[in-house]
Amino acid sequence: MNINATLLGQAIAFFIFVVFCMKYVWPPLMAAIEARQKAIADGLSSAERAKKDLDLAKANATDQLKEAKLQAAEIIEQANKRKAQIIDEAAAGAHSEREKILAQGRAEIEAERHRAKEELRKQVAALAIAGAEKILARQIDQAANSDIVDKLVAEL
């Protein structure tokens, strides 16, 4: 056998092998590789979109958090103003109620004092009449009259 014929036979066999591989083996391998490349590219683009969406969501969450904090601060401020208003109203009401009670107490004290004065006048008048009766009934000397007047003064 000649080396050239062997070489030619091997070249033909190799050529047939290459054609066979290109016809039946290569297309499924290329399809699998292309599918894998497409899947990887889709995954990367999906990851990129997800990253952008995440950044956008973080920005939105930060904005909403800031807005919520501002609203909370505003609500707290309104509550503090309302609290101060309620305290002022209560203080004004308590002050007016205090003045009313004091005025009523003063009026009661004045009425009681007036009643006590009237009672005292009645008692003084009764004592004066009783003293005058005793003086007229006894009609003794000046010393006895002075003694009766002194007793009346002591009773007053």
From Swiss-Prot:
It is found in: Cell inner membrane. GO terms for cellular component: plasma membrane; proton-transporting ATP synthase complex. Keywords: ATP synthesis, Cell inner membrane, Cell membrane, CF(0), Hydrogen ion transport, Ion transport, Membrane, Transmembrane, Transmembrane helix, Transport. The keyword Cell membrane applies. It comes from the Bacteria. Its main location: membrane. GO terms for molecular function: proton-transporting ATP synthase activity, rotational mechanism; proton-transporting ATPase activity, rotational mechanism. It is a single-pass membrane protein. Coiled coil: none annotated. The chain crosses the membrane at residues 11-31. The keyword 4Fe-4S does not apply. Pfam families: ATP-synt_B. Gene3D superfamilies: 6.10.250.1580. F-type ATPases have 2 components, F(1) - the catalytic core - and F(0) - the membrane proton channel. F(1) has five subunits: alpha(3), beta(3), gamma(1), delta(1), epsilon(1). F(0) has three main subunits: a(1), b(2) and c(10-14). The alpha and beta chains form an alternating ring which encloses part of the gamma chain. F(1) is attached to F(0) by a central stalk formed by the gamma and epsilon chains, while a peripheral stalk is formed by the delta and b chains. Belongs to the ATPase B chain family. F(1)F(0) ATP synthase produces ATP from ADP in the presence of a proton or sodium gradient. F-type ATPases consist of two structural domains, F(1) containing the extramembraneous catalytic core and F(0) containing the membrane proton channel, linked together by a central stalk and a peripheral stalk. During catalysis, ATP synthesis in the catalytic domain of F(1) is coupled via a rotary mechanism of the central stalk subunits to proton translocation. This is ATP synthase subunit b.
